[in-house]
């Protein structure tokens, strides 16, 4: 006799345990199970704020480790090519391909879940923006390492998702809302890193920052910490992007982190 399928509550609890143990692949499995169970419910039930945040944290950690690995390996590859070490460079390219296959598998997994369950079941504006931003993020991660037509397609999909999220955010979320600010942060990073459009990146980031600062006095205590943190990241990127040409470019561009608690971005 096969064991009973775990309940939604059991899967959420196991995901929390996996997070504490830093076993993020298992955390992804548990939260995918929750998302599919909710999406398969009558009418497609929406995830709770806690559940969607757990899903985001799980995937952000799984993808984040591979993105960091890819950057390190790509840097080593460039150095070996510069030294003329063709044999080493070929070995590194093969190893980079393995990491890229893992990145693609992870991105394809969450993008399929977003399209089949999460975006269609999202009712509130906040949820729609959250998931569309997430969709844009994972298409952007594909664009980071793809080339040619695949990169172009990933960039177009990123733009479409971020633009759809932005349209809803501008209409329905306050300028100080952490999810709206996180969207602006990541959208501006997309302009800068993927589209090589520093002017558009700076304009988007500055507008989001200025609009939020003008309404900061009306911000509730609950969101104040979250919002001001992302505003600081927007400012950090603006400083980096507008710094003089003598800068060594060693500073890291900031993105919106996965939420740690309900409401965080």
Swiss-Prot record:
- Any one Gene Ontology cellular component term annotated for this protein: cytoplasm
Task: Share what the entry says about its subunit structure, partners included.
Answer: Interacts with BZR1. Interacts with ABI5.
> Which Pfam families does UniProt cross-reference here?
14-3-3
Q: What is the lineage of its organism?
A: Eukaryota, Viridiplantae, Streptophyta, Embryophyta, Tracheophyta
Which BP terms does GO give this entry? Answer: protein localization; signal transduction
Q: What is this protein called?
A: 14-3-3-like protein GF14-D
Q: Which SMART domains match?
A: 14_3_3
Q: Which InterPro entries match?
A: 14-3-3 (IPR000308), 14-3-3_CS (IPR023409), 14-3-3_dom_sf (IPR036815), 14-3-3_domain (IPR023410)
Protein's job = Is associated with a DNA binding complex that binds to the G box, a well-characterized cis-acting DNA regulatory element found in plant genes.
Q: Give start-end positions of Basic and acidic residues composition bias.
A: 251-265
- Looking at the record, which segments are called Disordered? 244-265
Superkingdom per UniProt: Eukaryota
Q: Which family is this sequence assigned to?
A: Belongs to the 14-3-3 family.
SUPFAM superfamilies, per this entry?
14-3-3 protein
């Amino acid at each position: 006799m096969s064991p009973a399928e775990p309940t939604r509550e059991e899967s959420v609890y196991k995901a929390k345990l996996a997070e504490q143990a830093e076993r993020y692949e298992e955390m992804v499995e548990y939260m995918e199970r929750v998302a599919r169970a909710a999406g398969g419910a009558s009418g497609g039930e929406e995830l709770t704020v806690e559940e969607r945040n757990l899903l985001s944290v799980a995937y952000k950690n799984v993808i984040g480790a591979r993105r960091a690995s890819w950057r390190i390996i790509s840097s080593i590859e460039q150095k070996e090519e510069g030294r003329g070490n063709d044999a080493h460079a070929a070995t590194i390219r093969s190893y980079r391909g393995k990491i890229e296959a893992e990145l693609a598998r992870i991105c394809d997994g969450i993008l399929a879940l977003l399209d089949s369950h999460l975006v269609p079941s999202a009712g509130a504006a906040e949820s729609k923006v959250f998931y569309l931003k997430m969709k844009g993020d994972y298409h952007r991660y594909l664009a980071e390492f793809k080339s040619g037509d695949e990169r172009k397609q990933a960039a177009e999909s990123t733009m479409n998702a971020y633009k759809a999220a932005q349209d809803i955010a501008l209409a329905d979320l306050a300028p100080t809302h952490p999810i709206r600010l996180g969207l602006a942060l990541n959208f501006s990073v997309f302009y800068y890193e993927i589209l090589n459009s520093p002017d558009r990146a700076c304009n988007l980031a500055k507008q989001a920052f200025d609009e939020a600062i003008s309404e900061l006095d009306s911000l509730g205590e609950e969101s104040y910490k979250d919002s001001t943190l992302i505003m600081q990241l927007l400012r950090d990127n603006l400083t980096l992007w507008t710094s003089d040409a003598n800068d060594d470019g060693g500073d890291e561009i900031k993105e919106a982190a996965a939420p740690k608690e309900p409401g965080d971005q």
